[in-house]
Amino acid sequence: MSDDPLQTPRARQGRAPDVFRPGGWVPMRCHRDDEPVDFVIVGTGAGGGTLACKLAEYGFSVVALDAGPYFRPLEDFASDEAEQTKLYWTDDRLVDGANPLQLGSNNSGKAVGGSTVHFAMVSLRFRPEWFKSRTLLGYGADWPLDWREMWTYYTEVEQALKISGPITYPWGPKRPRYPYRAHPLNAAARVLARGCEALGISWTETPLATLSAPRGLAHPCVYRGFCVAGCSTNAKQSALVTWIPRALAAGAEIRDLAMAGRIEVDSDGLVSGVHYHREGGWHFQRARNVVVAGYAIETPRLLLSSATDRYRDGLANSSGLVGKNLMTQSNQAVWGVMDDEIRSYKGPPSLAITEHWNYQDWDKDFFGGYAYMSQGPLPQLWANTQAQARGLWGAPLVGEMTSYNHVAGLKIVGEMLPQERNRVTLADEVDQYGLRIPRVTYSWCDNDKRLIDHALGFMHRALQAAGAKDIWVQEDDTCHLNGTARMGDDPRTSVVDADCRSWDIPNLWICDGSVFPTVGGVNPSLTIQAIACRTADRIRAVARRGELTRRRGAQTKVATHAT
């Protein structure tokens, strides 16, 4: 049998790949399809992988499905940008709107571990006021969560991932020291530092989910620079090498190359399992609860694709909001040429950061905020950027690439506002499984444009103050995907409650970036994992009361077990 992870499932017959030992295996509990498990989880990234771990450790029986392959980082990942495109979700999707999104490498992964397998490891907490941005800051929507409670879950995730970060963090409430020391700054990070200091604002080392010291069988970062193309040393603390091994050890089953197609609903209106495609055919895994954690495009796609006579608009969609309020984050950049060699690709791509404009609410003409970080693009990505953003080709492109080692850049992660017109719907076209593909509609609002203009102007000044020449701006880029199944405290204006539980179907849960009411000006992965940890705790509490599949306001209780 072929061991090509793109063609043949690896997690099967009672074993799964050992991500820490080449060619090694670890035991894995397996369930029959007709054996109802406590939870089927669709997706194994920051939301699903974390939740699978926590629920299994709490004693629930868990089967986690992922459409992507089960990679062995030590063997499958190479210092080859073209080869590593296998990490990205590149299935057909339609895009439209005034600002159609470029989907793939910058915002969605397809692998056990989800997008964390190729993420840039930036691990930041939300500003506390963002959880009540409508009430406190006058825009967006309030979260049904308290920042103080989230602070405890942030700490749990930072410890679980051994985040490497500064001794003190300049913004927000006091927090514990990061578990591991910060990574040393490369030359690109020092350019950011010089620019910030020249303009009188604070900066610091970026908190990163990559090891600065050994951890068990995982080696510290060797600064090879291919972080977003897959870490071949296991220094990157993705879900694949953190939560998933813990989930397996606790008794969870992982099924790779398992594409979920439809959630089944029984005669009582409860979900009863998931239809999925694996090894050439369709299967049905029975479950007492279903969690959708496919990220902000695949999650609404699955919910909408599971419409029934009872739920004609799709599952969990009595509010009509499934698929709506899609939010990306602005990811524009400013680039310049320095006299000294920078070699910005040496080390993780974002070693220094400022959150100044996330925490300052005056002297700006937009709502929300943004962080900006140093950048370290790899050669192929840099050539593609030159061709796409500046139209360079042939001799001009070759000439530009000769200055590659002298280039420094600053790039934002900026907050884009929720808008119902930005949405995921189902197209008429179908994919290789016969499933309708998603149509993704996206347009910037005026506030988004003002934020981008402000950020580009400020970063231009910062780069100029740091000594850059030949400065140019990259005006059209986005990152991350959130929204489309927002949480809230009112079933008329949200899809799930604060516990990520569907208002409509009590044994259907959503646990990923889809539940974000707003997106903030920081990378979302730490918040997604914190929400997953909280959701696991809430599920355990509900189970202990015997209310795991009880309809809201009903008297009957269907209990399941938990330690």
Predicted regions: what is each one?
Residues 57, 61, 68-78, 233, ...:
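Glycine-rich loop(s) and the adjacent beta-strand/alpha-helix scaffold that form part
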Residues 8-155, 276, 298, 315-338, ...:
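N-terminal glycine-rich phosphate/pyrophosphate-binding loop and immediately adjacent elements
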Residues 253, 289-408, 412-414, 543-563:
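Mid-to-C-terminal "cap/lid" subdomains and adjacent gly/pro-rich loops that border
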Residues 3-17, 135-260, 480:
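Conserved redox-cofactor binding core of oxidoreductases
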Residues 36, 205-212, 216, 220-229, ...:
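A glycine-rich dinucleotide-binding beta-alpha-beta segment and adjacent secondary-structure elements
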Residues 73-74, 165-176, 471-477, 545-554:
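Short, glycine/acidic-rich hinge or "gate" loops at secondary-structure transitions
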Residues 120-124, 189, 203, 210, ...:
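Flavin (FAD/FMN)-binding glycine-rich loop and adjacent Rossmann-like elements that form
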